[in-house]
């Protein structure tokens, strides 16, 4: 006798149906993004149904968070790609694909070999530990030599950018990214690096400027250059140069009384500007509008004013100049002013910008991106952000490993060796983990248009015979020494990919029941 315990709008999937639903959803997500993997990967064109805007990208996290998904298992993979993006900045596609391949192998073990999911989980845990141990042993640390470490950073940036829209100019952008990160002196705070996108020109025209650039200009009749700048950054209303008494009615019997009211408003504004001038500043930056009258008052007092600076720009400017955003002006002694050596108005393309040089935070810099279309600039910014994120993490975790499928095959070898020391059905799960790892170089070769069966078997033979620096040369379709080619990746990135993918697979393997409830509606009763 079956008993209905769920409401009418609740659906349930049990046992094999639930597990199959989870596997199918996760594998479908992996198949969706795997064609973007590697230096020869393809892009996806995403079009929004609501705004009708288009986006061209091959960034795994961007693709997955832009598409609505209904399958709960698919959403788990979307979440791990987001975490990978937040933690390391790159490897989002790799972690999604590896999770999907682990689940594909698990499905075969459950369906064909009738192995219990808990046995597979135990095997995957042993395999993951063996893989990460092999990865650690293969890692190289050149942080003791500044020249070699800089070379490592450039190689990592090139490897990251080789699968992006910037691949044709990866040498140029790798230098830009490395120089910007080295200015941070070990910090991972990318807020000090401003990225500005300007339409026009080509990607190779992009450059790094050692200063902070704000997309604004000084007020009318104000000097275009300020030296030894003392900067007050504010978020306050300076637009009351008109009568603005909202929600109030008043009667006057002559225009003179109306003039008195306007005069009182102007006196109030004049007093506010006088308070601001007591801070001893020569530059005032406001997040809100500055109307003509207060701007003229600033000019008369020898203070340059900048209005309507965007929120992100104001926050970042406060950070790099050492100031803070204020909204009241009663206690000048308690306010931190921003400082820089020079502020000057410059032209980039056909737009005016303000350049802040010699900022208090000496690591501040700006990367100016040029490109023909908005889509190109947006994807270039995403690509560059990935490279900057990976490089900033590498300055903390300085170890590196080899790319081109080398690290995956080294881990696969270690996992296969581990499988020989394990009895029972768990060894089958460990071997399945090794096969999933080998799928990454297989997909790299497939995406490049080469015979993956031949290439990957050659790579496997080379690695298993002790040549631990071998990898896929996807430009020539051969096996080559990755160290000589400079195909280097961050150790932290590879470690995060393997550990996150195995954890995600474990989470979904434990599922034996999926319960879906529709969102509550206004007329739906609360239990």
Swiss-Prot record:
GO cellular component, one term: chaperonin-containing T-complex
Claim: rRNA-binding is one of the keywords in the record: no
Gene3D superfamilies, A to Z: GroEL (3.50.7.10), GroEL-like equatorial domain (1.10.560.10), TCP-1-like chaperonin intermediate domain (3.30.260.10)
SUPFAM superfamilies on file: GroEL apical domain-like, GroEL equatorial domain-like, GroEL-intermediate domain like
Gene: CCT2
Positions carrying N-acetylserine: 2
GO MF terms held by the record: ATP binding; ATP hydrolysis activity; ATP-dependent protein folding chaperone; unfolded protein binding
Positions of disulphide bridges: none
A single BP term in Gene Ontology: chaperone mediated protein folding independent of cofactor
Chain's role: Molecular chaperone; assists the folding of proteins upon ATP hydrolysis. Known to play a role, in vitro, in the folding of actin and tubulin. In yeast may play a role in mitotic spindle formation.
Protein name: T-complex protein 1 subunit beta
Entry's family note: Belongs to the TCP-1 chaperonin family.
Organism this protein belongs to: Saccharomyces cerevisiae (strain ATCC 204508 / S288c) (Baker's yeast)
One matching Pfam family: Cpn60_TCP1
